[in-house]
């Protein structure tokens, strides 16, 4: 893992991002992924720095606020051989980017989305994020939160994500295994990571979560995997119901997994059989610094003199 580490970072001491970063680094290493084929994409926020803090030959893309998923989908569809991982905060993915978050579920592109869920906008001094519950007042808020919250698990499942899980930033070993399963899953995977923010959220602290989280896989009766089509509705309903548990006990682990749904790449390949062998990223677009497509004749007809 040492080869993936950088020598510096500028997160606050105790930030949950450290656990997510470590779990991600270990997952990439243990899966034996080709570093040249791993692309990290992030939005704006404290989580947006993840591509800077994992050393990869292809590095990553630090994109616009709320637009990480759209960049990631474009990268994956242009070159489906790449392993694309998105990191975004709860505000980035479920606030300004929530339209893209929902729309992505319809396509089921084969990539992984990691949502850093700390209940606040940490980079801009702790305003309430979309996952903070109505009436909760953190130390950074002058008054209790005036908005209701979004349930990331339920939203992802109802939007069409085919792998939906939750991890806890301070349980790195467990989170690492979830990330590995999400990456290996064929389809769109979302991991909601409970991430304490010691600087701005004094409610959902390490002590708060340590007493409450429990692992779904410790229940032998819990089976989130859809094995045949007729199981889908029942598994989805149970997963959404389970995601409503909050307070004294908060579940972490895999809520829902369904590999019976075709990926977007497979759907494209059905219409364009050469797609996977010759994706858009392999197209020659320039020669000796000049574009291979000449639009001069087209523009001549539209030139105004």
UniProtKB/Swiss-Prot annotation:
[4Fe-4S] cluster binds at residues 12, 15, 46, 197. Heterodimer composed of an alpha and a beta subunit. Thiamine diphosphate binds at residues 44-47, 65, 91-92, 122-123. Pfam families: PFO_beta_C, TPP_enzyme_C. GO terms for molecular function: 2-oxobutyrate synthase activity; 2-oxoglutarate synthase activity; 4 iron, 4 sulfur cluster binding; magnesium ion binding; pyruvate synthase activity; thiamine pyrophosphate binding. Its EC number is 1.2.7.11. This is 2-oxoacid:ferredoxin oxidoreductase subunit beta. Its cofactor is [4Fe-4S] cluster; thiamine diphosphate; Mg(2+). It comes from Saccharolobus solfataricus.
């Amino acid at each position: 893992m040492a080869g993936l580490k950088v020598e510096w970072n500028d997160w606050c001491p105790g930030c949950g991002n450290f656990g997510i970063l470590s779990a991600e680094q270990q997952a990439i290493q243990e899966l034996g992924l080709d570093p040249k084929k791993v692309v990290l994409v992030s939005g704006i926020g404290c989580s947006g720095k993840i591509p800077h803090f994992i050393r990869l030959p292809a590095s990553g893309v630090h994109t616009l606020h709320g637009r990480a998923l759209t960049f990631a989908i474009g990268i994956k569809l242009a070159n489906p051989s790449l392993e694309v991982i998105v990191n975004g905060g709860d505000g980035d993915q479920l606030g300004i980017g929530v339209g893209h978050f929902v729309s992505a579920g319809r396509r089921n592109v084969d990539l992984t989305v990691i949502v850093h869920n700390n209940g606040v906008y940490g980079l801009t001094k702790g305003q309430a994020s979309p996952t903070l519950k109505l009436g909760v007042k953190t130390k950074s808020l002058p008054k209790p939160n005036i908005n209701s919250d979004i349930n990331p698990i339920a939203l992802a499942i109802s939007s069409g994500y085919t792998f939906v899980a939750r991890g806890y930033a301070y349980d790195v070993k467990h989170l690492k295994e979830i990330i590995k399963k999400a990456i290996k899953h064929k389809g769109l995977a979302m991991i909601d990571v409970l991430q304490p923010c010691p600087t701005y959220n004094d409610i959902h602290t390490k002590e708060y979560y340590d007493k409450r989280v429990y692992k779904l896989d410790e229940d032998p009766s819990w089976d989130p995997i859809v094995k045949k089509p007729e199981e889908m509705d029942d598994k989805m309903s149970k997963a959404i119901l389970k995601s409503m548990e909050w307070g004294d006990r908060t579940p972490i682990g895999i809520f829902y997994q369904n590999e019976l749904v075709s990926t977007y790449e497979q759907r494209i390949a059905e219409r364009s059989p050469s797609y996977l062998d010759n994706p858009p990223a392999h197209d020659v677009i320039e020669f000796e610094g000049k574009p291979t497509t000449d639009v001069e004749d087209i523009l001549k007809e539209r030139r105004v003199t």
